[in-house]
Amino acid sequence: MAALLRRLLQRERPSAASGRPVGRREANLGTDAGVAVRVRFAPSPTGFLHLGGLRTALYNYIFAKKYQGSFILRLEDTDQTRVVPGAAENIEDMLEWAGIPPDESPRRGGPAGPYQQSQRLELYAQATEALLKTGAAYPCFCSPQRLELLKKEALRNHQTPRYDNRCRNMSQEQVAQKLAKDPKPAIRFRLEQVVPAFQDLVYGWNRHEVASVEGDPVIMKSDGFPTYHLACVVDDHHMGISHVLRGSEWLVSTAKHLLLYQALGWQPPHFAHLPLLLNRDGSKLSKRQGDVFLEHFAADGFLPDSLLDIITNCGSGFAENQMGRTLPELITQFNLTQVTCHSALLDLEKLPEFNRLHLQRLVSNESQRRQLVGKLQVLVEEAFGCQLQNRDVLNPVYVERILLLRQGHICRLQDLVSPVYSYLWTRPAVGRAQLDAISEKVDVIAKRVLGLLERSSMSLTQDMLNGELKKLSEGLEGTKYSNVMKLLRMALSGQQQGPPVAEMMLALGPKEVRERIQKVVSS
């Protein structure tokens, strides 16, 4: 870079940047036939993937798939001091877990790689050289100390800090003298006063006069790493990105990016800036909130589809809000023109209900139910382990029966290994005294239930059991039907509340019900 700067000193610098001007575009999605739709999700690996990032990735994914396009993961890791170990792997892992894997990525590779900015430095250097040659960029020799003083002075005067463009109009002699002392200066981009208007697919026509509110930005740091503004423009161009769907916080920077496209003579992509995802109270969804990271939700048993559902249901882009949408339905129903400018308010208290709906859908599907059976077996082993008196509870037939009976009643698979459902896997410690406190007719009730099981153990249904249990309580003077149910619930589960007794009996099966009742009565 220093050698290039010296060569440029031998030539006359043009007074204005060259490049093809960016014209006004028609207000359409740019998805006409023959257009190769390519979008990118470009997070910085400065932290693990959280809900805000997932939403941006999802909108890119469903837009790409709706138009038979490609979804690219690019890691913007040029600020090496802030890179968090394991974050890059976590981001791609969580995208795959969520069911929205990239078509091209650091892990998967692809024709436009590498997909980490730290491995694309030569491209940024080439773009910087091109900008220096046309005079659209210039070296800056200002020290960090001077820049800090500028910032403090502006704040002291209640002004917005900005660079004063001190190095913008240095003479060739001045540049040569500075290069002799500092051969690796930062490179700044010369902001133009005339900024092209652009049609944002969400916010409409925009124009931000950046030169009037900020100084010329650094595009290449002295360490040879680019800043975000240059890197994203260079990468989007070389990767053939057709549409940039990103957070609305980048809307004001788009004019700067368009000036870079113009100076480099490149055609810019279509831009769509997505409104922010906020907490229900309107506060910012912060990475500092540990429970917004995807790995937290995965560990807690929330399904990917429920997260995709809730983060789209709270925002816009669809004709109506609707709980329970699957990923294929999201792709089919998504309409970028229906994304509004209003922030999306996320109410995570509703997530269990979203998860309940999606879990119920999985249970009702035979092949997916088999996968849930395997996962629940693992959960039971982990939760109870050596406490299992009877390992028959791990039998797939038994586990599947539990899932079918409790579908629609549980929000997470983990709920089935909570203390409330421990009776399904281990026998409760219930003494005779606990039953006597409920009714004096313990032996009579037990005898009738055992007789019922003997007569009809092969044809038990919940409706039949409900009817038989009501008949069973008839003729028991001083004992109400409700007390009979309390007694049986206590004998079977050791709990005073829970699912209907008839369902408990169906879940446990005639053999286990018989053994539990006999054990308690004889204790």
Curated annotation (Swiss-Prot):
Q: What stretch of residues directs this protein to its organelle as a transit peptide?
A: 1-41
Q: Which CDD domains match?
A: GluRS_core
Motif 'HIGH' region per record, residues: 45-53
A molecular function GO annotation? ATP binding
Which cysteine-cysteine pairs are annotated as disulfide bonds in the entry?
A: none
GO cellular component term, pick one? mitochondrion
In which residues does the motif 'KMSKS' region occur? 284-288
Residue numbers bearing the N6-acetyllysine modification: K486
Entry binding sites for L-glutamate: R40, F41, A42, E76, Y228, H229, L230, A231, C232, R246
Question: What keywords does the record list, in alphabetical order?
Answer: Acetylation, Aminoacyl-tRNA synthetase, ATP-binding, Disease variant, Ligase, Mitochondrion, Nucleotide-binding, Primary mitochondrial disease, Protein biosynthesis, RNA-binding, Transit peptide
Q: List-wise, which residues carry N6-succinyllysine?
A: K256
Q: Which EC class is this protein assigned?
A: ligase
Q: Where in the cell is it found?
A: Mitochondrion matrix
Residues the entry annotates as binding ATP: H50, E249, K284, L285, S286, K287, R288
Q: Which GO terms describe its biological process?
A: glutamyl-tRNA aminoacylation; tRNA aminoacylation for mitochondrial protein translation
Q: What is its EC number?
A: 6.1.1.24, 6.1.1.17
Which reaction is catalysed here? tRNA(Glx) + L-glutamate + ATP = L-glutamyl-tRNA(Glx) + AMP + diphosphate; tRNA(Glu) + L-glutamate + ATP = L-glutamyl-tRNA(Glu) + AMP + diphosphate; tRNA(Gln) + L-glutamate + ATP = L-glutamyl-tRNA(Gln) + AMP + diphosphate
Q: Which family does it belong to?
A: Belongs to the class-I aminoacyl-tRNA synthetase family. Glutamate--tRNA ligase type 1 subfamily.
Please give the clinical condition linked to this protein: Combined oxidative phosphorylation deficiency 12: An autosomal recessive, mitochondrial, neurologic disorder characterized by onset in infancy of hypotonia and delayed psychomotor development, or early developmental regression, associated with T2-weighted hyperintensities in the deep cerebral white matter, brainstem, and cerebellar white matter. Serum lactate is increased due to a defect in mitochondrial respiration.
Q: What does this protein do?
A: Non-discriminating glutamyl-tRNA synthetase that catalyzes aminoacylation of both mitochondrial tRNA(Glu) and tRNA(Gln) and participates in RNA aminoacylation for mitochondrial protein translation. Attachs glutamate to tRNA(Glu) or tRNA(Gln) in a two-step reaction: glutamate is first activated by ATP to form Glu-AMP and then transferred to the acceptor end of tRNA(Glu) or tRNA(Gln). In vitro, cytoplasmic tRNA(Gln) is slightly glutamylated, but with low activity.
Under NCBIfam families, the record lists: gltX_bact
Q: Which named protein is this?
A: Nondiscriminating glutamyl-tRNA synthetase EARS2, mitochondrial
Protein species of origin: Homo sapiens (Human)
- Gene for this chain: EARS2
